[in-house]
């Protein structure tokens, strides 16, 4: 294929692998200092070809989600990025991999999940979803994850309401919502407040 254009928030699927001479991911990333965005792409590249710092999910310890600096960007693997350019990805002559059924980096009961299709999610007694918005992950009772974006999924009935986020050992924010006195603010996956101070069980 001479060129491949990936349109942000629009579905993508590659039934089989192919090579593209040029790739354009049509998305404007924020270049605000320390602004964290999420992404998943269908091709690999060197981190030296990315304008910004890329981080991959590493572990969850003591209610803290740890991400570490990535040494490479793998196809179909979810990442976080602190971009230094609006279009931080430059790639030519890339192999676009076939789209897998699942795109997850798993550690214990937690997974960093990516998608190329719009996904409707509902947190319940066994699964809790955290969507990334406005510089932090927020707990979502219900929400929509758009193509080329990522989220955190906890398959643990004891998933906490809040989780600290660390990038290379540095705390950057809070994952989740305040659950003071058993009440929580309910957000959707875009970080918009849906209901304020409702019972945590609802």
Question: Could you tell me what each predicted segment is?
Answer:
Residues 64-66:
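N-terminal post-signal-peptidase region of extra-cytosolic proteins
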Residues 170-202:
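C-terminal outer-membrane/trafficking sorting elements
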